[in-house]
């Protein structure tokens, strides 16, 4: 089965072709970072218009690279939500039009399910069941995953997502857009320089006794330091390091607590913050002490991409999704809880 995946939930236009026997045949991604950098954040209307410009050329590109034609296509999967409504509509419209013209199934995929399943594209891949840490600019959640579509929410952020906190802290430090990766680079450079840590920031909700997160207080603590100190390169680096260490410690310890609570030994980390080197290092080190294994997507699949949508669509269709009432529906869900998707995809 050959599946075309389309991802347009925010500021990346991603497409991919996944074959259930041959694996990932081709994929392409266009990032709008440079365009939105001028405004310091994503402008929804500009994002939608750029998806319109980029999507069809990218689709033609991956078909040419894979050496297949539209007639070879068996199904289309697109990001149904959550995300920016206008951006989602672009991908949904193209998917629906192609599906109608080619007479192939069209399936809407939950964006977070795509991220959650993306480590299964790697080798070695995790097997169900596992705990998933979904950590990105819009979401921070711990899920117990017992099978495809079987997701139980263990905990989530009560305010800012981790990636959002990275971006906002970077802005306070005067770093460029996107701020999260810039902050991580600065923190890593400060650590490698051998300078001693100057600041200790709070670890919000570290000992709350549940699996929820909070990052707004951490951001406020950074603001206090910024207002108190002259922003020399050394001070800026020290604050970045202190912030990253605090955020990473909370993410690490909550994830290990979730493994202990569920009795599972596999942790899947997905989403843009999953590319953070210190987070990966800490998780690997701490998981090793309890006999657990951590799985990550390839770095190129940590951010939004079409490969994860094509793969999730293929898994859904192979599991019998073709009998689903939501197949062929032209819908988007800008706000959509992953845990609720089996109860109501159109909620």
Curated annotation (Swiss-Prot):
InterPro entries: ATPase_NBD (IPR043129), Gcp-like_dom (IPR000905), KAE1/TsaD (IPR017861), TsaD (IPR022450). Coiled coil: none annotated. Gene3D superfamilies: 3.30.420.40. The keyword Cytoplasm applies. Binds 1 Fe(2+) ion per subunit. GO terms for cellular component: cytoplasm. Its cofactor is Fe(2+). It catalyses: L-threonylcarbamoyladenylate + adenosine(37) in tRNA = N(6)-L-threonylcarbamoyladenosine(37) in tRNA + AMP + H(+). Its EC number is 2.3.1.234. Substrate binds at residues 134-138, 167, 180, 276. The keyword Transferase applies. Pfam families: TsaD. NCBIfam families: gcp_kae1 (TIGR00329), T6A_TsaD_YgjD (TIGR03723). Required for the formation of a threonylcarbamoyl group on adenosine at position 37 (t(6)A37) in tRNAs that read codons beginning with adenine. Is involved in the transfer of the threonylcarbamoyl moiety of threonylcarbamoyl-AMP (TC-AMP) to the N6 group of A37, together with TsaE and TsaB. TsaD likely plays a direct catalytic role in this reaction. Belongs to the KAE1 / TsaD family. HAMAP family: TsaD (MF_01445). This is tRNA N6-adenosine threonylcarbamoyltransferase. It comes from Nitrosospira multiformis (strain ATCC 25196 / NCIMB 11849 / C 71).
């Amino acid at each position: 089965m050959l599946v075309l995946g389309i991802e347009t939930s925010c500021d990346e236009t991603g497409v991919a072709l996944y074959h259930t026997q041959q694996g990932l045949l081709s994929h392409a991604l266009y990032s709008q970072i440079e365009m939105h950098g001028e405004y310091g954040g994503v402008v929804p209307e500009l994002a939608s218009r750029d998806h319109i410009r980029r999507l069809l050329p990218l689709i033609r590109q991956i078909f040419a690279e894979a050496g297949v034609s539209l007639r070879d296509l068996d199904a289309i999967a697109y990001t149904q939500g959550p995300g920016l409504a206008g951006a989602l509509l672009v991908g949904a419209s193209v998917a629906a039009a192609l599906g109608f013209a080619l007479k192939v199934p069209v399936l809407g995929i939950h964006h977070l399910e795509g991220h959650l399943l993306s480590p299964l594209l790697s080798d070695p891949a995790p097997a169900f069941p596992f705990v998933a840490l979904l950590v990105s600019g819009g979401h921070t959640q711990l899920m117990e995953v017992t099978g495809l579509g079987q997701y139980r929410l263990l905990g989530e952020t009560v305010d800012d997502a981790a990636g959002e906190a990275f971006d906002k802290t970077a802005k306070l430090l005067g770093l460029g857009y996107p701020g999260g990766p810039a902050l991580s680079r600065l923190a890593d450079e400060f650590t490698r320089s051998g300078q001693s840590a100057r600041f200790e920031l709070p670890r919000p909700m570290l000992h709350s006794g549940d699996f929820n997160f909070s990052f707004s207080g951490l951001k406020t603590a950074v603001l206090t330091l910024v207002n108190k100190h002259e922003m020399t390169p050394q001070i800026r680096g020290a604050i970045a390091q202190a912030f990253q260490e605090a955020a990473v410690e909370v993410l690490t310890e909550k994830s290990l607590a979730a493994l202990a609570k569920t009795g599972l030994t596999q942790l899947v980390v997905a989403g843009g913050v999953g590319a953070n080197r210190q987070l990966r290092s800490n998780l690997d080190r701490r998981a090793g002490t309890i006999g657990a294994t951590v799985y990550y997507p390839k770095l190129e699949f940590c951010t939004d991409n079409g490969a994860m949508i094509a793969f999730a669509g293929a898994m859904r269709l192979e599991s019998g999704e073709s009998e689903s009432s939501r197949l062929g529906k032209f819908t988007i869900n800008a706000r959509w809880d992953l845990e609720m998707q089996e109860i109501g995809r159109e909620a």
